[in-house]
Structures are given as structure tokens and as C-alpha cells.
Amino acid sequence: MAFPTSVPLLILLLTFGLLGRPGSATDFVIYSDPPTALLPGQMFHYDLTPQDIPYGRASLVMKPDCNLVLYFNGSKTWATNTTGLGDNCYLTIDSHGEAIVQRNIHYPVWRSNKTSVVGSYAFLLQWNGELGIYGPAIWSSSNEGELSDPKPSNITTDYVFYSYSVLPIGKILEYKNYRLVLRDDCNLVLLDTNTNTQDIKWQTNTYSPLHDCFITLDPNGELFVKHNRRDILWRSNETTNSNFSALVLRYDAKLVIYGPQLWTTKPLW
Ligand SMILES: *[C@@H]1O[C@H](CO)[C@@H](O)[C@H](O)[C@H]1NC(C)=O
Ligand SMILES: *[C@@H]1O[C@H](CO)[C@@H](O)[C@H](O)[C@H]1NC(C)=O
Ligand SMILES: *[C@@H]1O[C@H](CO)[C@@H](O)[C@H](O)[C@H]1NC(C)=O
Ligand SMILES: *[C@@H]1O[C@H](CO)[C@@H](O)[C@H](O)[C@H]1NC(C)=O
Ligand SMILES: *[C@@H]1O[C@H](CO)[C@@H](O)[C@H](O)[C@H]1NC(C)=O
Ligand SMILES: *[C@@H]1O[C@H](CO)[C@@H](O)[C@H](O)[C@H]1NC(C)=O
């Protein structure tokens, strides 16, 4: 894990509001809004095998030689092939959903070449070791955005939930000091675990005495809290024309649903 090497680049990124989050070794999402970047020499890393989730280790590395390289389960699986095209190259995603590798200062050396309407987008190192761009955002929790614990964490936790997943009572997602939990009484709550009282930042205010609830995300991006096998306790009510979406617990404490999948290194179908 390396840190940004170029002061001019840092100033540039700050000038343009890009939040680099050095030390984000176990992160695996880049956002268009508020913007984040994978900076020169930085790497994303994803490994849930210690938590008995049987996918291989994945990493995405913005190499100092300007090549953006994806590794999965020990092998190189994809690259932008931009070696030697510039110095201080970094990866961002823009408000049209296009991923761009730029060299110092702003010259693009690689683009994903798929654009969509203006909105908020997320670039994910996915659970299966592939890359995916999702958006625009179709739903967001109503709490105020804020900055998470600035301390870097090297513990991988899962903070993305995909369509076709079903999760029972318990921890749903965790990002640093933020945790989304489906409680035993069927209330879906977003907590700040840094506070003694575990402040609730957002909740569905749902209740069921049956202790059998679960959450699902439909392919069209609608999030549900259900119980009694399939009865709906809560729904997000926003949908998009999509067959695959992602719910992300972002670094600013907001839950956001992005869909459809606009670009990927390997289609699911
Ligand atoms: C990862 O590599 C190991 C050892 O080479 C192999 O047994 C395993 O099936 C691979 N996992 C995936 C998801 O490809
Ligand atoms: C990079 O080069 C490899 C090997 O030539 C090729 O298979 C791959 O498609 C290229 N990547 C991109 C993004 O074009
Ligand atoms: C994107 O489009 C440019 C210009 O047409 C082309 O040179 C480049 O190879 C394309 N990139 C990908 C990843 O397809
Ligand atoms: C995380 O970082 C700390 C301090 O650098 C180190 O002691 C610990 O072993 C690391 N844990 C993992 C799982 O890498
Ligand atoms: C979704 O719509 C239902 C029915 O109109 C409404 O009762 C519920 O409050 C809405 N949910 C949200 C999260 O807005
Ligand atoms: C759903 O997946 C199929 C198969 O890849 C694809 O052709 C189609 O465009 C997708 N539909 C939507 C609405 O995204």
C-alpha cells in the first residue's frame, strides 16, 4: 500500500474536490459524488475468505507506471494496458458513469467508453473479482452525509449488497464505524459504532414479532424488508430499468442504491 507520491497531484485533487482517502487498502468502491479516486500507487483489496465467504482474493492496483491492473485469486485477470503512458496516473469515475484513468495533470489515457445520464455513479471491485460500474443512484437513505473514521482500516468487511441476495437477521453491511443491521425485531438500522450509544443514523422503523425477517434487493433496484416468508414490511419504492443493482454503505454514512450495471469487465449473463 503506497501513498500519493506527487504533491502537485495532491493539490490538484484537493482543488477539484477529489477525496483520495490514502490508506484505504481494504476499500473497493470509487464514487463520482462526492468524488473519490484510486491514486498513483494505491490499491484496492478485497478478501472475504477469513469470513468464510468462498471467493478468491481480489485487488485492483493503480501502478506507478500508469497501468491499472486487476488480480483475482493470485492471477492477473485484466488491465488497461496503459503502461508508460504517463506519470502519477489515477482512476476516477465521472457524473456520466465513465471510468477514466488520467495522467498528471488531466490528460485521459484510458476510458471505459460507456456513458449514461448525469447522476451519481459507483465503480466497484465486485464480489466475483470483476469490475463493474453501477448507476445512476436511484435511492438514498435520508440521513445527512458525513465523514467516516479517517483511520485506515485493513480489515475487509462487506459493504455492498447485490441484487438476487437475501440476508436474514444480523449484520448486513459494515464500513469502518458504520454498520447496517437487521435487528431481531425486524427494524433495519444504520448505526455509528464509534459512539457509546451506537447512534442510529437511519432506520426503517419496521417491526415484526415473528423474528423471521430478511432483506432483499430486486434486480430493478428496489430494497425490501420482508417477514412471514414474503410479506412486505418496508420497501424503498424506487426502481430502474435494470436486471442488476447494488446497495452500497458509503464512506459518508449514506446507504445508496445504484443501478443498472453500466459497464463491466465480464458480463454476468
Ligand atoms: C482460487 O485458486 C485456488 C487454488 O489455485 C482454486 O482451488 C480455487 O478454485 C480458485 N477459486 C476461484 C474462485 O477461482
Ligand atoms: C490488454 O491486453 C491484453 C493482452 O493483449 C488483452 O487481452 C486485453 O483485452 C487488453 N485490455 C484492454 C482493456 O483492452
Ligand atoms: C475507447 O474509445 C477510444 C476512442 O474511440 C478508443 O481508442 C479506446 O480503445 C476505447 N477504449 C476501450 C476500453 O474500449
Ligand atoms: C492490520 O494492521 C495492523 C497494524 O498495522 C497489524 O498489526 C495487523 O496485523 C493488520 N491486520 C491484518 C489482518 O492485516
Ligand atoms: C413506499 O410506499 C408506501 C405506499 O405508498 C408508503 O407507505 C411507504 O412509506 C413508502 N416507503 C418509503 C421508504 O418511502
Ligand atoms: C439483462 O441482461 C441481459 C443479458 O446480458 C442483457 O442483454 C440485457 O440488456 C439486460 N437488461 C437490462 C434491462 O439491463
Set out the residue ranges of the language-model regions.
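Beta-rich ligand-binding surfaces for carbohydrates and other polyanions
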Residues: 2-269
